Amino acid sequence: MASVPVYCLCRLPYDVTRFMIECDVCQDWFHGSCVGVEEDKAAEIDLYHCPNCQVTHGPSVMRKRRGAVKHADVGLGRDSGRPVKTGSAQFVRELRCRTFPSADEVLLKPTGAQLTVEFLEERSFSVPVLVLRKDGLGMNLPPSSFSVTDVEHYIGTEKEIDVIDVSRQADLKMKLGEFVEYYNSPNRDRVLNVISLEFSDTRLSNLVETPKIVRKLSWVENLWPEESIFERPNVQKYCLMGVKDSYTDFHIDFGGTSVWYHVLRGEKIFYLIRPTAANLSLFERWSSSSNQNELFFGDQVDMCYKCSVKQGNTLFIPTGWIHAVLTPVDCLAFGGNFLHSLNIDMQLRAYEIEKRLSTADLFKFPNFETVCWYVGKHLLDTFRGLRENRRHPATYLVHGAKALNNAFRGWTRKESLGEHEQEIPDTIKTQQLVKDLAKEIRLVEDIFQQNIGRSGTPFGGSQGLPSPHPKAQLNTPLTFSQHLSKKRGPKPKEAFGGGGVGPPGAKKKSQKGKEIKTEAGELDLLEIHTKHTLKKFQPGCKVKKSKLELPDDCLDDFEEKINKSKLKLVLTNGKLQGKKGRAGSANGAGSSLQQFQPHMATLSDFDSEDELQIDETPPPRRRPSLPSKKKLAGLPRKLPRAKPCSDPHRIREPGEVDFDIEEDYTTDEEMLTMQGVKGGAGGILDLLKASKQVAGLDSALSEEAPASPSTRDAIQGMLSMANPPSSSSSSSSSSPLSISGGGEMMGLMKEKGGREGWMSGVKKSERKAVFQRPGKRPIKRPARHLSDDESLDEQETLGTCFKDSDYVYPSLESDEEDHVSKSKMKRKRNWDDTPWSPKARVTPTLPKQERPVREGARVASVETGLAAAAAKLAQQEQQKTITKRKYTKKKTPQEKVHSTVAQLQHQPDSAPVSPPLPSEPPVDCIVEERRVEVYSASLLDHEYTAGPGPFSPGGPRGSGAMAPGVFLTSRRPSLSPQNSSSYSPSAPSPGGLVTPTSAGACQGKRPKKGLATAKQRLGKILKIHRNGKLLL
């Protein structure tokens, strides 16, 4: 077995942890500690002679300095051919003499108690923060008498540390005991600086506690799992020991981390550069240049600020700030780095710059990508939780999540997965996380766009400090709740012409454009609603900066009552729910609101494009109500309301906005009972008023403006087609709502341009509308996102029902849990429900596409519709011909022949059918014909449901209801509008109409092709295609 080679005077084997130097004479290796050669000084030796060789060859030969320059002849290095090196004594002297802009221009200087998460959220932590005293910061530090000797005592003399040789800007390793000896020596031959002594795992850690704000924001402190197989990054606690004239060149802290410094003894001077896109590009170019140590980066940027941190001061430097540090006197300081969620995008940009510059691992954030994966999972859970609780994340959190998700996509690409795979935790499913996080971000952005509007920058530009009052005032423009929709809602500070109604003792600012600070705990919800209303209902004559002028007495009275009552209200399903014992106050405030009604009556209509927005995440079994064309006076509906945290004990998490955003889900019926209805004659309200006798509307509605006779006839025809016995339609049992189970209706919507469109109604909780305006495409309301399970259940439930492709059938929501209460509500609501719905769907008429036709196939619903139309027309003819005026006209010879043959073949129970070519009917008959034609389409769209009528067991004819699939030819002849007695002037009686039953019965002119039989003519009149579908 070969022996292990030994070296040096001590004749020990090679030790990789000990510095060794080779003798240039005997070629033997010696430990530096054994021959008295320090590692940092070895570079100055040109030829080394070991102690044995020094006897024969003399001492070691040192390197000669070439072209030594006298410092007195050098300015900034520009007067001579050789520039000044960074960190040299001349460089430090020149740096001390230079003038820089003061950092007071950009610094924030709060007290320790004011520096909270909310403080940094409002200002996005985008500028440095200097705290003059440590009181209130929540950190523990040794006393000011603590020295480097004490550091050695708590950490250990043999602790190997990284030291920077300032003059050469090079790294070297030393034992802590050696550095302390150098630090305490009066004669120092060089300048050494310690900036990377992390002591989290030492006894010194028990004496130092990081600031409370750092512990709250730090990713590693809060999100790093204890069971992680990766090594926990320890970058929170550093001890910085520097002697006079120590200098650290410009840099960005690793991983884009933010950093805190507290000077325990001495002083440090920071040179700060803002991380703009241009400055970051210049920094990357400067860092990769070959003459970096000859260029002062502060000369290449527009602004370099100087900030002096004295003993007892604490400085917080935000993400990405480029900074250099000069130590004018011996200094002992503590600091640390931390990642946070306030500026994720900048952290990732700094990390990418590090990678492009090939930074050594020693100066990188350990396991940076692993931390990011844990944070991504946390953000996904946060977004889901906030959305389920109807609370919204702050803007900076959404932007940070988007940047983080984009980084995840880059790290998991096939071509780059190899170099990033080792930092991915095993508990993270990367592809699923990227997909789910992108979905949550999309949902949040949709909510922002529809309910709150697109906000500009995440935070306002104000840098003012909160009031030192114990109840810190909330700088409202800096919270996300201020960014309400520019289209749909005002900012709370703009209501009442810029003056807010605040709690007693609160200061008021009437100057325009100034921010109004309101104490969060004192905000009145009713006041916010009123401010929303006054801002929303602005006169149409002024597009911008218009204010609603109200009498001073109304405002004073309203303000006085609010201040007296101190209302604390919660909006539940559009109803004001006050606390116990405050009903009288609520009523008083409601009476004050009534004073505003006369002034709101002059407000103009709103553009429907601004109003057709709904929340995508309403509560489960409830759909938000839609605003009508005419906005009802009073409190606004579907407006996001900024409400302080309803739970006084709720702790707002970082990244959550201070205000809850709430929507109003008041139904149309509730709004009609609470507020007056305003509309013009000939509009939609005329249809409601004309049908009040059927739907049980309040008689006060019809007294304002009576409907025209034609409109009333149209309504009566519509109701009679939906339910044959029109005489009993006023009762709840025979109304069209009760026939279809109390939840469906048909309506006729008259639009602004005078056109009429059909609306097929659905349940109030399921309405979605498309308002068709003249000359414009339909405006559709965005539907809320349904889960996959809900969609599948609806499709399975409705899959067997007949559906016409020309109509859109809104989905039905499940109500298994509360079907009992809903059924009671339906029965109670049937008697006063209206036949017109502003939320019914009206779809545009599109060209029909060719479909495959099966020969001999018959559609059951079409046959049923034909039977219903024929029976109804027969009953109408019998009723109308009794009182109608008979029109006699001279018959043509051909008509006489038809009349004679028909009378010979007439049977008592035969259905009346007109000749193929009837003469022109009177005007009244034409109106009736058009109405019946249109209603036939709606009958075919809905399955016929039996009720008290001619086809029911209790009907006049005594026959059962027409079942689907039973054809007209086997029951009774068909009836068409043109075959009624009102169109046949020659008809002697309602039952004496002519019926050509065979080709031989009529000896006159041969009928047209396709019109030979009654069924063909009826199909032609009703515009039914041969395959049983409607032709629109």
Swiss-Prot record:
Residues that coordinate or bind Fe cation:
H251, D253, H323
Residue positions annotated to bind substrate are T248, K268
Query: Which of the seven top EC classes does this enzyme belong to?
Result: oxidoreductase
Polar residues composition bias: which ranges? 473-483
Catalyzed reactions per annotation: N(6),N(6)-dimethyl-L-lysyl(36)-[histone H3] + 2 2-oxoglutarate + 2 O2 = L-lysyl(36)-[histone H3] + 2 formaldehyde + 2 succinate + 2 CO2; N(6),N(6)-dimethyl-L-lysyl(9)-[histone H3] + 2 2-oxoglutarate + 2 O2 = L-lysyl(9)-[histone H3] + 2 formaldehyde + 2 succinate + 2 CO2
Biological process terms from the Gene Ontology for this record are: brain development; chromatin remodeling; embryonic viscerocranium morphogenesis; G1/S transition of mitotic cell cycle; inner ear morphogenesis; negative regulation of rDNA heterochromatin formation; positive regulation of DNA-templated transcription; positive regulation of transcription by RNA polymerase I
Q: What is the effect of changing H323Y?
A: Unable to rescue a phf8 morpholino mutant
Which InterPro entries does the UniProt record give?
Answer: JHD, JHDM1_Histone_Demethylase, JmjC_dom, Zinc_finger_PHD-type_CS, Znf_FYVE_PHD, Znf_PHD, Znf_PHD-finger
Q: Where is this region: Disordered?
A: 455-515, 577-660, 697-857, 875-923, 943-1015
Q: What happens when the gene is disrupted?
A: Morpholino knockdown of the protein results in defects in brain and craniofacial development. Embryos show delays in brain development at 24 hpf and apoptosis in the developing brain and the neural tube at 30 hpf.
State the CDD domains in the record.
Answer: PHD_PHF8
Q: What is known of its domains?
A: The PHD-type zinc finger mediates the binding to H3K4me3. Binding to H3K4me3 promotes its access to H3K9me2.
Family named by the database record: Belongs to the JHDM1 histone demethylase family. JHDM1D subfamily.
Its recorded name reads: Histone lysine demethylase PHF8
Q: Organism, per UniProt?
A: Danio rerio
